[in-house]
């Protein structure tokens, strides 16, 4: 952790130097070349910006394909991209530990947008035995006891999209009409996705599911489900032996048939739970980023969330 703090400190110094160099030229004063330059920390934010901005924006997703956003640290090239952006979109809730270090240097040059503004946050409680509150506080992550995975709830994703739309309108008011229309179309698709999840949950036999790490708190909260997580808010957290026994006991109690594993993270501990419970593996996509293969296949937020809905429906089946 100390090494990571030191690296972020060095990044902050580099950021200040880059921004001071760009500030005099006015490189980030607006869409002078006809398009807004947008940098986004997470894939969902980049996708929403592309859908809303359309032909008026150029969007850069900072996290490389196949990299877990929890572990991402900006490179010097990323620093230059952010300093040259008209808008920087970040999720907030502590997921991007580097943002606070660079915000002060960017202010005045770049419009900095917390895409989760207005979303009611879920706080975790290690003393709860069930639901999205089940995780160990001993292994605190940068986002503390608040779940940052708001984009997995289509309703909260709609709020994030609205925040992005408002930012684009503020930075580029002459294209307000296009941004509003594109947002309305995106909002309708998110409403449809919300209905799809509701129908999936209503048809399900059970209300509990086991997942390798606690990324589905907002999804569980939205649809009245019980998330049983093997590890905490960060996939790198290792549960204590006591927590592991509790997870196995709870999974058996709810007669789960499947355990949901994230696509970018392989958890040996979760696989141990799977064997103990006698469950089968299923994937759930956290959507923090896409792999190169997924990009090549034309996958996007909606195609992957629809697959998540299908797999969640299976995971809610009971023995």
Predicted regions and their residues:
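Extracytoplasmic metal-acquisition and chelation regions
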Residues: 2, 7, 21-319
């Amino acid at each position: 952790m100390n090494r990571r703090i030191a690296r972020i400190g060095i990044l902050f110094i580099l950021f200040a130097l880059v921004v001071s160099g760009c500030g005099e030229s006015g490189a980030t004063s607006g869409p002078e070349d006809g398009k807004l330059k947008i940098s986004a920390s997470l894939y969902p934010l980049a996708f929403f910006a592309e859908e809303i901005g359309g032909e008026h924006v150029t969007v850069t997703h900072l996290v490389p394909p196949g990299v877990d956003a929890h572990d991402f640290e900006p490179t010097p090239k990323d620093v230059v991209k952010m300093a040259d952006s008209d808008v920087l979109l970040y999720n907030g809730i502590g997921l991007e530990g580097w943002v606070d270090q660079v915000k002060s240097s960017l202010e005045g040059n770049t419009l900095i947008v917390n895409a989760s503004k207005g979303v009611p946050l879920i706080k975790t409680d290690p003393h709860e035995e069930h639901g999205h509150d089940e995780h160990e506080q001993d292994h605190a992550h940068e986002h503390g006891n608040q779940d940052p995975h708001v984009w997995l709830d289509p309703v909260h994703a709609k709020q994030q999209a609205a925040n992005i739309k408002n930012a684009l309108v503020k930075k580029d008011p002459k294209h307000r009409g296009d941004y509003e229309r594109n947002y309305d179309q995106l909002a309708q698709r998110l409403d449809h996705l919300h209905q799809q999840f509701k129908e999936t949950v209503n048809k399900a036999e059970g209300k509990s599911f086991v997942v390798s790490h606690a990324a589905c708190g907002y999804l569980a909260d939205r649809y009245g489900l019980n998330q049983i997580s093997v590890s905490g808010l960060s996939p790198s957290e290792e549960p204590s032996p006591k927590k592991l026994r509790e997870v196995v006991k709870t999974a058996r109690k709810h007669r789960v048939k499947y355990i949901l594993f994230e696509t970018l993270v392989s958890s040996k501990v979760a696989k141990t739970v799977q064997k103990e419970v006698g469950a089968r593996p299923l994937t759930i996509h956290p959507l923090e980023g896409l792999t190169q293969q997924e990009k090549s296949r034309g996958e996007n937020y909606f195609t992957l969330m629809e697959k998540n809905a299908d797999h969640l429906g299976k995971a809610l089946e009971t023995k």
